[in-house]
Amino acid sequence: QKCSATSRVYVHQSVEEEFIGSLKKYTEGLKLGDPRERDVFLGPVIDKKAKETFTGAVELTRKDGGTVITGGRVRTDGPFSRGYYPEPTIATGLPRGHSLERRELFVPFLVAGTFKMFDEALARANDTEYGLTAGIFSEDEAEVDAFFDRIRFGVCYANRRGGATTGAWAGRQSFGGWRASGSTGKGVGGPYYLLSYLREQSQTRR
């Protein structure tokens, strides 16, 4: 339910098995529960509609030939009986351009895909009406430069271990989306954003 949380990832096919395996293991180690407890990573989603968005995404994945490699359930046992607690979920194997790659779900559901060429990954990343946050991990500085030049998102990161697409520092980074993720293209906290709170007045004498 965090606006900048990663909802899709594109992995180079040469490291697909290793990366997806590590991601699956890490995801299965995340604790779901009461968010007031310090060791809990993930709490409930906000309402029944969000829960239904999650279950709909799981069903659509399976219907369209994808695979849910971890998660996929809404917990209702014991302490999970009060509220809606979807498990952190990863889906793979969906057709390129699938709607689950392009929609904003705001639930713990990640779509993972693979690519051969950098340009392909960039095109798929941009193939959505939204444009809030994006990130890249690469040892090739030319790729990083191309990512920053061509990605159509407002808040972008490269090789950031603290969060691939999330965790802007207030007062240090502007924060705002492009396209359907924003209205002006000007980020909160940036020098241009202040102008949104000012009015212009033309004054003429004589």
What are these regions (language model features)?
Residues Q1-C3, R8, Q13, T70, ...:
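Conserved NAD(P)+-binding/catalytic subdomain of aldehyde/semialdehyde dehydrogenases
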Residues K31, G43, V58, S81-R206:
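Conserved C-terminal structural/oligomerization subdomain of aldehyde/semialdehyde dehydrogenase
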Residues Q13-K31, L195-S202:
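Conserved core segment of the aminotransferase class I/II
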Residues Q13, G72-R73, N159-G162:
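Short secondary-structure boundary segments
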Residues A57-G65:
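Helical element adjacent to the flavin cofactor pocket in flavoenzyme catalytic cores
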Residues R8-V15, I90, S183:
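Short beta-strand and adjoining strand-loop segment in the mid-core
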Residues Q1-R8, K24-G56, R73-Y85, R102-V107, ...:
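Flexible, acidic loop-helix segments that line cofactor/substrate-binding pockets
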Residues H12, L23, T61, P108, ...:
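Residue-level signal for inorganic ion chemistry
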